[in-house]
């Protein structure tokens, strides 16, 4: 059952609930955290969360942060660019950035090597500007 339109796309109830929970979160969330938050809305099993997350990734509405095993809402309409996530290891803040030159370099490298990427995400761990000054 489709219920919500997001960026011109119709989302199912579960997709809309997961997207809403991620949008309201102050940092990326894991699947089990999402499940706990959404139990009152009818989520009973991790598979429901994972299916919704997979579909939201396919719709380019969320990103999976591999190193954190967590998901976050896509902050921009840069679907051709490679997102770069700056992850603060002290406070847990995550910011999404885009760089056309970096994306072009990744595309060029892939083409030269005959590699066809499904997706590319870059994660940089360190300290954010607030924590580095502490």
Question: How would you describe each model-predicted region?
Answer:
Residues 28-38:
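Short acidic, hydrophobic short linear motifs in intrinsically disordered regions
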Residues 37, 41, 90:
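Residues within the alpha-helical elements of helix-turn-helix
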Residues 59, 63-68, 72-134:
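Non-DNA-binding regulatory cores of transcription-related proteins
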């Amino acid at each position: 059952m489709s219920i919500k339109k997001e960026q011109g796309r119709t989302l199912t109830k579960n997709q809309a609930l997961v997207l809403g929970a991620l949008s309201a979160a102050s940092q990326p969330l894991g699947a089990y955290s999402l499940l706990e938050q959404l139990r009152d809305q009818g989520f009973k099993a991790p598979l429901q969360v994972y299916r919704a997350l997979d579909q939201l990734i396919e719709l380019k509405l969320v990103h999976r942060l591999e190193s954190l095993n967590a998901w976050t809402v896509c902050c921009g309409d840069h679907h051709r660019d490679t997102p770069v996530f700056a992850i603060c290891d002290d406070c847990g803040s995550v910011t999404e950035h885009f760089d056309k030159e970096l994306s072009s370099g990744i595309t060029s490298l892939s083409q030269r090597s005959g590699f066809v990427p499904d997706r590319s995400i870059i994660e940089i761990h360190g300290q954010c500007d607030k924590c580095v000054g502490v």
